[in-house]
């Protein structure tokens, strides 16, 4: 399979090296002409952060080795610290309103704040079909 050059849109992808976000990365590389801007939030409280960063590096090298034309389509990672994400009362109020109705992880508060703070516009996040959030909440995100 050959990979097209990236003359399509830039997609901001929250990529952790997990299988769900890696699937989306590969889907964008193989099925579209998009350029991927990987985004990763460093949380020093999470012990898996270093492993995830090493995994993403290995995956990216493997993709480029297998599909050399993909190299220019995966931009260098943008890394952000969770501790540097600015507060935003409007976003947090919306999150709390939704969290009263559905069980939501705190990332649904700080990810939109990150996107707004850094002008990321749309920020794609992969969610495994059998994990939360479910049902009506997906339409609210």
State what each model feature region is.
Residues 1-141:
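ATP-dependent adenylation/nucleotidyltransferase module used to activate substrates
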């Amino acid at each position: 399979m050959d990979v097209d050059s990236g003359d399509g849109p830039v997609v901001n992808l929250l990529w952790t090296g997990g299988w769900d976000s890696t699937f989306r990365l590969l889907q964008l590389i193989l099925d579209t002409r998009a350029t991927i801007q990987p985004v990763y939030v460093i949380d020093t409280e999470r012990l898996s952060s270093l492993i995830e960063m090493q995994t993403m590096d290995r995956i990216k090298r493997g993709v480029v080795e297998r599909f050399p034309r993909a190299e220019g389509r995966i931009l260098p990672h943008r890394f952000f610290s969770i501790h540097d994400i600015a507060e935003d009362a409007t976003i947090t109020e919306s999150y709390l309103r939704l969290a009263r109705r559905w069980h939501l992880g705190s990332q649904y508060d700080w990810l939109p704040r990150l996107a707004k703070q850094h002008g990321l516009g749309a920020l794609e996040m992969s969610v495994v079909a059998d994990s939360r959030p479910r049902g009506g909440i997906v339409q609210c995100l």
